[in-house]
Amino acid sequence: MENDLICLGVITSSHGISGHVKIKTFTENPEDFTSYGTLTDGINTYEVEIISIISQNIIIAQIKGIVSRTDADLLRNKKFFVEKNKLPNPTNDDEFYYSDLIGLNVVLENNNVYGNIKKIHNFGSCDIIEIRLSNSKKSTMLPFTKDIFPYVNVKEKYIIITLPEVIGNNSDIQR
């Protein structure tokens, strides 16, 4: 996927019998999901209309041309993207897009480089930062919280990490 595309959401399931889909949105406000025009999966484009907002990050939507549950079921796990230049620019230093974090150096409070950000995941409960450790081919994953990552500087390409207390073997962690 090109770096200039930002994922706005993913279809989690069909909804009903008339081709509606349930979409998990990654926008700050669910109603913004369709505010940026036509969406793409990287190959095809889609016109999406919000039917209802279920929760802070779940919407029911109709996709143009999808008219049956069978059609909708075929789209399960499809991700929708928009060109980054169609999105508003962050207005504060503490605002950023998650895609801007990929590749940033992860720096300990003593200024030693711990690694760099490989990927950001969300397995349901919270966002997880995957870090490729320096001096190793290993990766580690930590929850993306203010306690663990108190400072992000996208312009200077680094993020500060305060390592949490670890239960069990922490021999891979170099402080």
Swiss-Prot record:
Gene3D superfamilies: PRC-barrel domain, RimM. Residues 93-167 form the PRC barrel domain. The keyword Acyltransferase does not apply. One of its GO terms (cellular component) is ribosome. InterPro entries: PRC_barrel-like_sf, PRC_RimM, RimM, RimM_N, RimM_N_sf, Transl_B-barrel_sf. An accessory protein needed during the final step in the assembly of 30S ribosomal subunit, possibly for assembly of the head region. Essential for efficient processing of 16S rRNA. May be needed both before and after RbfA during the maturation of 16S rRNA. It has affinity for free ribosomal 30S subunits but not for 70S ribosomes. NCBIfam families: 16S_RimM (TIGR02273), PRK14592.1 (NF011186). The PRC barrel domain binds ribosomal protein uS19. Binds ribosomal protein uS19. This is Ribosome maturation factor RimM. It comes from Ehrlichia chaffeensis (strain ATCC CRL-10679 / Arkansas).
